[in-house]
Each structure stands twice: as C-alpha cells, then as structure tokens.
A protein has these predicted regions:
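Bacterial N-terminal signal peptides
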Residues: 5-15
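Inter-heme linker and motif-flanking segments adjacent to c-type heme-binding CXXCH motifs
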Residues: 52, 117-121
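Electrostatic cytochrome c docking/interface patches
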Residues: 16-38, 54
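Extracytoplasmic/secreted proteins, especially bacterial periplasmic and envelope-associated proteins
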Residues: 30, 34, 38, 78, ...
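Gly/Gly-Pro-rich "capping" loops immediately C-terminal to redox-active cysteine motifs
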Residues: 36, 52-80, 102
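The canonical Cys-X-X-Cys-His
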Residues: 35-49, 96, 111-115
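Axial heme c-ligation environment in periplasmic c-type cytochrome domains
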Residues: 59-64, 85-118
Length: 121
C-alpha cells in the first residue's frame, strides 16, 4: 500500500504543470500594442490593470493572469475560447462574459498578446 501511494504521488508530481515539458500553443499574429487599450477597456475592470485580478467584489475571486505557474501553461487557444465564448464554455465562472460578439478574432488575439506581456510572479 505504501509503495502504491509513493508511485501515485510521484505520478502526480511528474505530470503537474510546473514539470510538464509539452509545448504550449502560442499565436504569432497578435499585436500587444493593439491589445493594450482593448484589455484596459474590456478586461481590467475585473482582472485589474496589472492582470492580478484586483476586483475583490466578485466571488469567486477573478483569475490572476500573472501567476507564472498558471499562465505559462495555458494555451492561447484556451484563452481565445474563454474570451470569445465566456467562462462557461470552458467550465469556468459564468461571471466571465463572452466577448466574441464585441471583439473581432484579431482583437482577441491582440488582447492575448497583451496578456502575455504582463509581468509574472
């Protein structure tokens, strides 16, 4: 039983995001400079100007976009879906609205490019 526990813990440790070696999908056609004002207008009210999720009026608290152990392992396609279709589309909070009707495909890619420029910790 002890060996099984050790093996299971080892498997969890090796497959955790901090140790994953997979390449994470990144878009190459987003423009962070164009995404900055879009982020400020549509995202910062909840996620904060610095991406740290400063809107403490929400429960659960808004996702911190600058946590290195989180954001570095999130594919751009996932972020695209969350922004375009809302949190519910990926099993997350319904408080995250769908911006696909407001933002173009390029706008969303630009916002993602801007998010990728935020300092992580």
């Amino acid at each position: 039983m002890r060996l099984l526990t050790i093996l299971m813990l080892g498997a969890i440790w090796l497959t955790s995001p901090a140790f994953a070696q997979e390449d994470v999908e990144r878009f190459t056609d987003g423009n962070a400079a164009n995404g900055a004002p879009l982020y400020k207008r549509y995202c910062s009210g909840c996620h904060g100007a610095d991406g740290r999720g400063g809107a403490h009026t929400f429960m659960p608290h808004i996702q911190n976009l600058t946590r290195k152990d989180y954001i570095e392992f999130i594919p751009d396609g996932f972020l695209y879906t969350v922004i375009a279709e809302g949190g519910v589309a990926v099993g997350k909070s319904g408080y995250m609205p769908a911006w696909g009707g407001t933002l173009s495909e390029q706008d969303i890619k630009d916002v993602i490019a801007f998010i990728r420029t935020l300092p992580t910790y």
